[in-house]
Amino acid sequence: MAIHFISDLHLADDTPALNQLFLDTLAAWRGRIAALYILGDLFEYWVGDDDDSPYLAAPLAAMRDFAAQTPLYVMRGNRDFLLGAGFEARSGARLLDDPTLIEAHGQRILLSHGDALCTDDAAYQQFRAMSRNPQWQQAMLAKPLAERHAIARHARAQSEMNKQQTGLTDISDVTENAVRELLAAHGWPTLIHGHTHRPAHHLHDASSRWVIQDWHGGRGGYLLLDDGGIRSLPLGN
């Protein structure tokens, strides 16, 4: 059976069409594929495993149902880096390190969210290093839930304002040097990642790099891996 890869769904309480597309997709794929890998930013933000936001109930329940029949793996992204053991218990998913190397259908596949490869964005890389620090995370998770939500909403608003002002810029894309260093360190496998919202297929010497389609406006996409190779396919209307 095929393996499917998705990323950058950015599910939130104000994205009902995307939330429903996720539920429908899990129902359609449950028990019919070998595994599903979600490579970061499943949620627009994740303020801690104790988050009791009402909109989370449906996707987490659907994930549990899915994981009961089909292996489900989730990688943390730049929006949901606080996913932890509590999320695993609530969703039935298994969290993956970034990067993770798998072997399937005769291929060596390196999985990453992709944000660590955007090395020209020095300010973001500084934030990434800080936000992955266990002490920083412990301090953040010690704050009241309402305060964490307020911080996340502010960060989301700031991010949207920056996007409107600058759009997709070169510094928000991966760099050739970072990609080549990562591929070389793992023996030049095929690389699959998300994050950049620039779905495409690239070649780096003998290695392929696939960028997964982000989800928006009730539509999305996924990568399918089977004995015939890797293909990019659409989801939604």
Swiss-Prot record:
Primary localisation category: membrane
Pathway(s) annotated for this protein in UniProt: Glycolipid biosynthesis; lipid IV(A) biosynthesis; lipid IV(A) from (3R)-3-hydroxytetradecanoyl-[acyl-carrier-protein] and UDP-N-acetyl-alpha-D-glucosamine: step 4/6
GO biological process: lipid A biosynthetic process
Free-text comment on the cofactor: Binds 2 Mn(2+) ions per subunit in a binuclear metal center.
Compartments where located: Cell inner membrane
Pfam hit, one: Metallophos
Binding site for Mn(2+) 1: D8, H10, D41, H197
Substrates-to-products reaction catalysed: UDP-2-N,3-O-bis[(3R)-3-hydroxytetradecanoyl]-alpha-D-glucosamine + H2O = 2-N,3-O-bis[(3R)-3-hydroxytetradecanoyl]-alpha-D-glucosaminyl 1-phosphate + UMP + 2 H(+)
InterPro entries: Calcineurin-like_PHP_ApaH, LpxH-like, Metallo-depent_PP-like, UDP-diacylglucosamine_Hdrlase
Gene3D superfamilies referenced in this protein's UniProt entry, alphabetically: 3.60.21.10
EC numbers for this chain: 3.6.1.54
Cofactor: Mn(2+)
Topological type in the membrane: Peripheral membrane protein
Top-rank EC class of the record's enzyme: hydrolase
UniProt: substrate binding residues: N78, R79, D121, S159, Q164, H195
Keyword Nucleotide-binding: no
Single GO MF descriptor: UDP-2,3-diacylglucosamine hydrolase activity
GO cellular component: cytoplasm; extrinsic component of plasma membrane
Keyword annotations of the record: Cell inner membrane, Cell membrane, Hydrolase, Lipid A biosynthesis, Lipid biosynthesis, Lipid metabolism, Manganese, Membrane, Metal-binding
Binding site for Mn(2+) 2: D41, N78, H113, H195
PANTHER family named among the record's database cross-references: UDP-2,3-DIACYLGLUCOSAMINE HYDROLASE (PTHR34990:SF1), UDP-2,3-DIACYLGLUCOSAMINE HYDROLASE-RELATED (PTHR34990)
Family recorded in the similarity comment: Belongs to the LpxH family.
Role according to the record: Hydrolyzes the pyrophosphate bond of UDP-2,3-diacylglucosamine to yield 2,3-diacylglucosamine 1-phosphate (lipid X) and UMP by catalyzing the attack of water at the alpha-P atom. Involved in the biosynthesis of lipid A, a phosphorylated glycolipid that anchors the lipopolysaccharide to the outer membrane of the cell.
The protein, known as: UDP-2,3-diacylglucosamine hydrolase
Organism ancestry: Bacteria, Pseudomonadati, Pseudomonadota, Betaproteobacteria, Neisseriales
